[in-house]
Amino acid sequence: MSRVANSPVQLPSGVELKQNGQDVTVKGGKGQLAIQIHDSVELKIEENVVTFAARDGAKASRAMAGTMRALVNNMVTGVSQGFEKKLVLNGVGYRAKAAGSTLNLTLGFSHPIDYDLPEGVTAETPTQTEILLKSANKQLLGQVASEVRAFRPPEPYKGKGVRYADEFVRRKEAKKK
């Protein structure tokens, strides 16, 4: 079994963590995030170090302690540094444009797609074929990136579509006569 919960979470300067019962709030330069700690997990805050432990020795409690530690660590990283995901558009006429909290996509359909970004996620388009999504919330960022990719996932024959910048698209050979 993994022992993720055994390593404590360090709070960098400028990050404040507050606990109210099972509710934990993390504030930092990039925003504020909140989470509810599972009942089987005990959280201790000592100066700039946060430790997690299972309330009992059950396997599920130890696993949940590791999960909660990872989630709080992602929150601390998010409010201090932030997260970003890069998407690349491949295809003739495929374009993206960020306008405020809306992402305008032209992906070869008969109509353009206007995707409203949720609160806490910002989009930049350094070029017409690149989308840079930024957020303090790692889970929300991944969800938004997945939804944008789902409009036109990369196809295996020509590689056209929306893909993550670090994604490898496995190519297929065209059918021979």
Curated annotation (Swiss-Prot):
User: Do you know which InterPro entries this protein is assigned to?
Assistant: Ribosomal_uL6-like, Ribosomal_uL6-like_a/b-dom_sf, Ribosomal_uL6_a/b-dom, Ribosomal_uL6_bac-type, Ribosomal_uL6_CS
RNA-binding as UniProt keyword? yes
GO CC annotations on file: cytosolic large ribosomal subunit
Q: Which UniProt keywords apply?
A: Ribonucleoprotein, Ribosomal protein, RNA-binding, rRNA-binding
Q: Which GO terms describe its molecular function?
A: rRNA binding; structural constituent of ribosome
Q: What does this protein do?
A: This protein binds to the 23S rRNA, and is important in its secondary structure. It is located near the subunit interface in the base of the L7/L12 stalk, and near the tRNA binding site of the peptidyltransferase center.
Q: How would you summarize the oligomeric state and partners of this protein?
A: Part of the 50S ribosomal subunit.
Protein name, UniProt field: Large ribosomal subunit protein uL6
Q: Which organism is it from?
A: Teredinibacter turnerae (strain ATCC 39867 / T7901)
Taxonomy, top ranks, is:
Bacteria, Pseudomonadati, Pseudomonadota, Gammaproteobacteria, Cellvibrionales
Task: List the gene name.
Answer: rplF
